[in-house]
């Protein structure tokens, strides 16, 4: 929070969103943190370099105005929930699902098995209040591939219904980072929680994307991070 007070966390965000549009300053401040505390540097990177940047680069105006102020001020500590226990860096094969329910206009986020736990996620074990969760989007019975969703995890430090989290335990280093596992049991989120810069689901469940090819859409989303 001292870094927030000193405006050291906002370099990389646009001015209209309370940032300074200074990527060089963002990189320099991140590099300098290693001189003080390597765990703090990684926590910094998770909050503003992964969680915040995913909302900025994969979301649209609604997400920017609704979520980014809390991210930049650290009112909403967050996680970047991509890696899974059984899938590692094979993001295209992740098992977490987000199935659209047109009756309620909600996505249902679910972890189908132990291999699909989000694992070694920074901020997950203790501090994370929300996460950008990568999941297979299902709508109208079809799998549209991996998409990113804003998913609340905790409220005032307590896990929300259906959200599970455990600490990954002691590591060989960087033990100031609360790496943990995340899993979801039929967690419902609003339709607007889909970070929809490249694709969207309409209220009736119909899916649309400016990138027709599923593979190209997948790599475009990853490349935007």
Where are these regions (language model features)?
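Internal helix-loop-helix
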Residues: 1-75, 126-127
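Long, well-ordered alpha-helical segments
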Residues: 63, 104-110, 155-158, 183-197
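Glycine- and acidic
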Residues: 11-15, 32-36, 48-52, 114-118, ...
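Glycine-rich beta->alpha junctions and the first turn(s) of the following alpha-helix
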Residues: 169-225
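Sensory/regulatory domains in signal-transduction proteins
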Residues: 54-57, 84-89, 116-117
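A short core secondary-structure module
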Residues: 102-164
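Internal maturation/activation junctions in enzymes
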Residues: 69-89
